[in-house]
């Protein structure tokens, strides 16, 4: 922690053992000096701490003489009284006299009475210490980070059990951030920690099907480092089997199945109801030996047998991973792309279904994958691919009806509900726009929904009074809502901004067979959404959304997940400290020890793609995209570049991120840079070559975008780095504990060596003054700019992989 941080309650981790073992000293209420002429009331804990410090100093000075003196005093302890803190009073001086207080105690307090009093005092002191720790746990500043720290560091079962119960009081999203840490502690730490964590995990699994699957995937991934014989009988494996057995279903009443001829009651007239079809999409019958079987649509079966909740989603994810494995066997990228489109086209025959994209943050059902938009990403040995997924947002994933399949060749008859979310559509009207699946008993995939030849989609009536003139501008848009005073805008400013926007529209990339992802990633996200929606049979639904995801097979994403957690923690720290640094953490989903999913960064392409497509330097590309160096657009993009560059330089330094070639650094449409691919952090480096020895990557091209070494923006960059490092070290414990807990039982390359955590702590430079930190930042910036190893590694990547 930094010098300015003050803990609200000064309780150390070492106090826990004192609290729960009951070994605290007796309460010290009064200290008597001399013959009782003066007395001073002192806080008992302060006095005890002071006595302990004095005793330690005496032992350091006198060594063994103190120990011998203690033995002598201990032998005579029965002859005299004792102080309230348990230490014996001085007996006989050199002249043979005893103190007045000693004589009083000998006369008035027998030994047995003193023992009882001391026991009572120790009990009171123990209760006081317990209340101290309880006050810490119940104070408003006690957050999830502190709870995880106590759970990891405490050796007392009582504290661990209390923290396990305390987890129920925190928000779900706060605890979910530490889910990898909780599950790793459950797998690799002692039983007391596991017993404290398990009730919360089981409770959440009963509440959420998405949480259940994430736990199962993480438990499998973090158990993979164990020996195979140990892994079979580990707690993590047992809990994973419990989750996947679907025994943790919520204990609620089964859903009622509507009659076959009626739709859910949405207030429609009887004549309209007769056109609705009912659907039973809940029951899943699965035969693992013959892949997937079609959903049973018999209502009688559904009422008798509860569905397997997790099977459809698991099979959906398994299908996506299988595509990636098959693509990796093909030699050329063109063949991989053709195979990917064919595989996804077949996948669409199983959709819509009660499946979802785990990287999304809202409930939805997957209805379609536009297969022609999918692309294979750059990778030498593997075949990661990017897909776009059409979903329909719903209120509850498990209880909402799955929309019916609409054939691809069906022509939509209307576009009038393209922008319905803002037009006053009620929940009942939105629900009535869905039809349901007919009762077919065909044999097909477990997570698919039956195809329908003919479909009648009923659209809700529009409230025209709330949507009239939706594209017209109101005069109120340029006036304050409280005050109707007009805001005057100079005509010259309007003309200048319009001319800048027209003259410097973003460029497009040409199609490259060796890099098909460049064109797809360069297209603005808003245009892509509009284009795909227009060509989708589901695009007319008001709750239609477009998501994207990168599917990776053959890569261990556990290090990526760890780096993502550190980035989120640093982002939160800099926001709380009001340091204007910019980073873009992206979601990582670990499926197993060698597969997972990644949230793509939209509106961003790699610097390698920029240089290859434009054949320009980074500065000239900025000028081409944002206008001349005096325009508002360029200055904004330059500031964004500086703020993001400073942030990622600190991230790369603290985590020792390697493999920083231009294919792993993105540039978005607003000028930010985003680092991706954190496969080499902390103690690991590519092939252990040791090319990259600088603190971070800072090339001459980066400095040129900042305006040169003597520019104001370059000085601003160094100032941001200093402010960011000062803010980060104030909260060092929050960052370090995320990494330290994941080292337990891990065989990841980033944890090789015994000094990983110690070196991480040293990079926060807790012993330096701010002036010394400023000198350090200057040295790191200068060393990174002049680093010959950075140039060597870029050259190595160009020769071996063609990365510019």
UniProtKB/Swiss-Prot annotation:
It catalyses: a 1,2-diacyl-sn-glycero-3-phospho-(1D-myo-inositol) + ATP = a 1,2-diacyl-sn-glycero-3-phospho-(1D-myo-inositol 4-phosphate) + ADP + H(+). Its cofactor is Mg(2+); Mn(2+). Residues 675-699 are annotated as: Activation loop. Residues 529-535 are annotated as: G-loop. Residues 656-664 are annotated as: Catalytic loop. It is a peripheral membrane protein. Keywords: ATP-binding, Endoplasmic reticulum, Kinase, Lipid metabolism, Membrane, Mitochondrion, Mitochondrion outer membrane, Nucleotide-binding, Transferase. Residues 55-245 form the PIK helical domain. It is an enzyme of class 2 (transferase). Residues 69-122, 251-309 are annotated as: Disordered. Its EC number is 2.7.1.67. Belongs to the PI3/PI4-kinase family. Type III PI4K subfamily. PANTHER family: PHOSPHATIDYLINOSITOL 4-KINASE BETA, PHOSPHATIDYLINOSITOL KINASE. This is Phosphatidylinositol 4-kinase beta. The lineage of its organism: Eukaryota, Metazoa, Chordata, Craniata, Vertebrata. The gene is pi4kb.
């Amino acid at each position: 922690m930094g010098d300015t941080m003050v803990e609200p309650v000064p309780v150390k981790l070492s106090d826990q053992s004192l609290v729960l073992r009951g070994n605290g000293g007796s309460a010290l209420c009064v200290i008597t000096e001399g013959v009782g002429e003066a007395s001073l009331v002192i806080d008992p804990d302060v006095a005890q701490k002071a006595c302990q410090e004095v005793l330690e100093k005496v032992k350091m000075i006198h060594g063994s003489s103190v120990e011998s003196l203690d033995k002598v005093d201990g032998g005579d302890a029965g002859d005299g009284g004792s102080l309230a803190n348990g230490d014996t009073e001085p007996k006989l001086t050199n002249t043979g006299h005893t103190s007045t207080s000693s004589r009083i105690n000998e006369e008035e307090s027998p030994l047995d009475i003193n023992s009882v009093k001391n026991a009572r005092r120790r009990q009171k002191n123990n209760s006081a210490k317990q209340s101290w720790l309880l006050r810490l746990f119940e104070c408003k500043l006690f957050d999830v980070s502190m709870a995880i720290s106590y759970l990891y560091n405490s050796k007392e079962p009582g504290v661990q059990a209390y923290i396990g119960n305390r987890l129920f009081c925190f928000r779900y999203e706060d605890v979910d951030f530490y889910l990898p840490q909780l599950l790793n502690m459950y797998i690799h730490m002692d039983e007391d920690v596991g017993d404290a964590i398990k009730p919360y995990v089981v409770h959440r699994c009963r509440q959420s099907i998405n949480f259940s699957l994430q736990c199962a995937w993480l438990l499998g991934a973090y158990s993979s480092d164990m020996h195979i014989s140990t892994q079979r009988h580990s707690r993590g494996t047992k809990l994973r089997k419990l989750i996947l057995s679907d025994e943790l279903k919520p204990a609620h009443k089964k859903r009622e199945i509507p009659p076959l001829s009626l739709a859910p009651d949405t207030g429609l007239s009887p004549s309209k109801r007769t056109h609705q079809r009912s659907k039973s999409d809940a029951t899943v019958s699965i035969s693992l030996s013959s892949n997937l079987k079609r959903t049973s649509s018999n209502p009688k079966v559904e009422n008798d047998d509860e569905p397997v909740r997790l099977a459809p989603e698991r099979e959906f994810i398994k299908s996506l991973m299988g595509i990636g494995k098959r693509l990796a066997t093909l030699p050329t990228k063109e063949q991989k792309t053709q195979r990917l489109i064919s595989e996804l086209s077949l996948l669409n025959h199983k959709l819509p279904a009660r499946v979802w994209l785990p990287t999304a943050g809202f409930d939805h059902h997957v209805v379609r994958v536009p297969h022609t938009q999918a692309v294979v990403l750059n990778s030498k040995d593997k075949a990661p691919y990017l897909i776009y997924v059409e979903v329909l947002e719903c209120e509850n994933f498990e209880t909402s009806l799955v929309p019916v399949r609409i054939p691809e060749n069906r022509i939509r008859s209307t576009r009038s509900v393209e922008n319905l979310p803002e037009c006053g559509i009620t929940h009942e009207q939105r629900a009535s726009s869905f039809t349901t699946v007919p009762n077919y008993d065909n044999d097909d995939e477990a997570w698919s929904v039956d195809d329908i030849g003919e479909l009648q989609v009923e659209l809700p009536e529009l409230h025209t009074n709330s949507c009239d003139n939706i594209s017209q501008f109101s005069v109120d848009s340029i006036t304050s809502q409280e005050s109707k005073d007009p805001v005057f805008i100079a005509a010259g400013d309007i003309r200048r901004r319009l001319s800048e926007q027209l003259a410097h529209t973003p460029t497009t990339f040409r199609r490259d067979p060796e890099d098909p992802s460049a064109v797809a990633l360069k297209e603005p996200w808003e245009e892509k959404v509009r284009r795909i929606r227009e060509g989708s049979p589901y695009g007319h639904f008001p709750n239609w959304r477009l998501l994207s995801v990168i599917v990776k097979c053959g890569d261990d994403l556990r290090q990526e997940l760890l780096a993502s957690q550190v980035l989120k923690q640093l982002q939160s720290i800099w926001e709380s400290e009001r340091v204007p640094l910019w980073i873009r953490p992206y979601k990582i989903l670990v499926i197993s020890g060698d597969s997972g999913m990644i949230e793509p960064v939209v509106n961003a392409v790699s610097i390698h793609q920029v240089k290859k497509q434009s054949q320009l330097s980074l500065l000239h590309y900025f000028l081409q995209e944002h206008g001349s160096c005096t325009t508002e657009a360029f200055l904004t993009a330059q500031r964004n570049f500086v703020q993001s560059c400073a942030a990622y330089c600190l991230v790369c330094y603290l985590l020792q991120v390697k493999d920083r070639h231009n294919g792993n650094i993105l540039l978005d449409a607003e000028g930010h840079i985003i680092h991706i691919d954190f496969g080499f952090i902390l103690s690991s480096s590519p092939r252990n070559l040791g090319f990259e020895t600088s603190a971070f990557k800072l090339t001459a091209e980066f400095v040129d975008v900042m305006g040169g070494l003597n520019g104001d923006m370059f000085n601003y960059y160094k100032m941001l780095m200093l402010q960011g490092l000062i803010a980060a070290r104030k909260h060092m414990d929050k960052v370090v504990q995320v990494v330290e807990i994941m080292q337990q039982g891990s065989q990841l390359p980033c944890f090789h060596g015994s000094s990983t955590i110690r070196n991480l702590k040293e990079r926060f430079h807790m012993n330096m003054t701010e002036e010394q930190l400023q000198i350090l930042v200057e040295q790191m910036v200068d060393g990174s700019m002049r680093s010959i190893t950075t140039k060597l590694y870029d050259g190595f990547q160009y020769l071996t992989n063609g990365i510019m």
